């Protein structure tokens, strides 16, 4: 008699982690948890533990988090970012400072995910929140901080106007990260990616 098929165990055969990524590319492996079962994420965590590979688990829901922590109990978990990092201590920062700017408090979770990703990629990263264009004075009050950053990541929903505003104030590269929050009028659901 054959054993019943176990989808999570069968899926483990298809998980091919890139254990050499950090050396080859300069950044660690990441496991995108959304869309995976907790068992599949646990299988990935087991493979990571066996290899000792630095890894980020992103978009981790409560069941994913429980699965990872059952295998890697010392993994660092950030509820706002919905992310786990293992090993829990990030590398020493090197290179220029990253500034993550969140337009509104609804953008905070994505902004925190960006900040922690930068930290685990070995960059010093600061987070500025609730500086959307509805209160221009708030972003202008941070002008010195904006201008001292090596790169700026702007996380914004609504109409997505903040990245353009910030880019006009600084000489550093500005990366726009659209979110699906807000009720802006531009182009329906596609407003902040156009």
Predicted regions and their residues:
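Short glycine-rich or small-residue beta-strand-to-loop segments that form or flank ligand, phosphate
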Residues: 28-31, 97-103, 152-154
